[in-house]
Amino acid sequence: DFPAEELLGVKGVYCTPHLGASTPESETNCAVMAANELSDYLKNGNITHSVNLPDVSQPRVGGKRICIIHRNEPGAISAITGILTAANLNIENMVNKGRKNVAYTMLDVTGNVDAGLTAQLSGIDTAIRVRIL
């Protein structure tokens, strides 16, 4: 089950999907799995079992990790890498996956990541959300 449309985007309301567990054991297992997947996303940017985004996972190789949700359109990756090149950041590891009209790109970079990088990446026409971990 999915949250009611009128609750999406309401300040202070955090909508989560129905887990569908039918026994105490499965409820616990589903809750633990969901918590682990959410923790992995928050700490590492990895996405597992998302309804809206593709599954994307890569091991951390050090440095900073940049996670970008963007429209799946030509030129999106070159815009991202162009900004990173201009900032003198080296891409150590990168993965990009799309699902229909949305894509998710994770990049592990080395170099001096300054505070303005999030704003620069957010300014890309195709960018939806940018996080630097």
Summary of predicted features, one role per range:
Residues 1-60, 104:
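Rossmann-like dinucleotide-binding domain for NAD(H)/NADP(H)
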Residues 48-133:
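A conserved regulatory-domain signal marking ACT and ACT-like small-molecule sensing domains
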